[in-house]
A protein has these predicted regions:
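Alpha/beta-hydrolase-fold enzymes
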Residues: 108-191
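Short beta-strand/loop motif that positions the catalytic acidic residue
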Residues: 209, 215-217, 221
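N-terminal cap/lid segment of alpha/beta-hydrolase-fold proteins
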Residues: 1-28
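Conserved alpha/beta-hydrolase
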Residues: 51-74
Length: 295
């Protein structure tokens, strides 16, 4: 593996111990990519392939397990307030950007499934800060029915049935099912309602998305609707926006498809990032003292 991998625990402003990880090229990174994982998922193992792939192509890649997810502390996959996830991600990501060796580097968000919503809301918190986002099968919904009708069949949680329908390759599927850091039970009602509320609010404000983005979706995805990505592309105010739909591919574009398909997806992602990493040296300045964390 031609990249350096590091893990670290950090304490957030609420006193919660959060797991963070990074994949770095041995040369100076050409840009920074910040990972936002899906509901019930985690960065260190599940998103390892993404981290290695991007870092081996020269990007500094940073991930964080949300409170209650993966190796972070907190009630298991209980999301009391989605805003806490956005706050933790924003504070951690900006603490990295404030470090001397990373100042002036382009900064990109990368979100898969629910992580797509995390990435967009992190952008919304400080629209001028981010240089772009890669959104893989993002989660938010068109809601034309009552809450109690939606929650029982809302396929955002990686339970057994969803794992079966999200990850096409049977070997990769079983490996994911065996990852004990992934939450595979049904969500608490409060968590489901919070996710639904967040999705509804995000859907109502898609026109406020202004950063460059690349949204990718498998046309055969039965976990998150490809029409969600089409709606984002159509309604976002971004001047630089790209959509790619992959015929026959499922939800797990970077982790559950046959290797040849995964290579196609990563080739598209890297091409998009490379083009936008070369454009200019960014001028947005931040105060390192504001975004310091306690290890």
């Amino acid at each position: 593996m031609d990249v350096e991998y590091c893990e670290e625990y950090r304490m957030n402003s609420r006193g919660v111990r959060l797991f963070t990880c990074r994949w770095l090229p041995f040369s100076c990174p050409k840009a920074l990519v910040f990972l936002c994982h899906g509901y019930g998922m985690e960065c260190g193992n599940f998103m390892r392939g993404v981290g290695i792939k991007l870092a081996s192509h020269g990007y500094g890649v940073f991930g964080i397990d949300y409170e209650g997810h993966g190796r972070s502390s907190g009630a298991r996959c209980y999301i009391k307030r989605f805003d806490n996830i956005i706050k933790d991600c924003s504070e951690y990501f900006k603490s990295i950007c404030a470090q001397e060796e990373y100042r002036g580097k382009k900064r990109f968000l990368y979100g898969e499934s629910m992580g797509g919503a995390v990435a967009l809301l992190t952008h919304k918190k400080d629209p001028g800060f981010w240089d772009g986002a890669v959104l893989v099968a993002p989660m938010f919904i068109s809601l034309l029915t009552r809450v109690e009708d939606v929650i029982p069949k809302w396929k955002i949680v990686p339970t057994k049935d969803v794992i079966d329908s999200a990850f096409k390759d049977p070997v990769k599927r079983e490996k994911i099912r065996g990852n004990k850091l992934i939450y595979q039970e049904k969500p608490r009602l409060k968590t489901a309602l919070e996710l639904l509320r967040t999705s509804m609010n995000l859907e109502d404000s898609l026109n406020e998305v202004t950063l460059p983005f690349f949204v990718l979706h498998g046309e055969a995805d039965t976990v998150t609707d490809p029409d969600v990505s089409r709606a984002l592309y159509d309604r976002a105010s971004s001047k630089d926006k790209t959509i790619k739909l992959y015929p026959g591919m499922w939800h797990g574009l970077t982790s559950g498809e046959p290797d040849d398909n995964i290579e196609i997806v990563f080739s598209d992602i890297l091409s998009w990032l490379d083009k936008r990493s070369r454009r200019w040296h960014r001028q947005y300045q931040i105060d390192p003292a504001v975004y310091s964390w306690h290890g």
